[in-house]
Amino acid sequence: MEDIIVKKKYEFTYATIEVDGRTLYRIRALRDFGNVKKGDLGGLIEHEGNLSHDGNCWVDDNALVYGDAKAYGNARVFDNAQVYDNAHVRS
């Protein structure tokens, strides 16, 4: 069986905020996908488990995803939305 390698689509920047005792990091796109262009700044996430590198999902603007929450598929979390605890967002 062939292994599928997914190229990372974002990285963490040094811009952070504290929410509920957790450190969230602003993300930056590493490649073009969907409506996102390489270099675009996104919203803030706590860890890589919050936003899949697959699909066109993205956290944008001042949106937050943290805790055990996850955005995947083609979901877009934007404006001032907050996704946290065990919530999953998929489109």
Language model: regions and residue ranges:
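A detector of tandem-repeat and repeat-rich interaction/domain scaffolds
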Residues: 52-91
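Terminal amphipathic alpha-helical/low-complexity segments used for targeting or macromolecular assembly
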Residues: 1-56
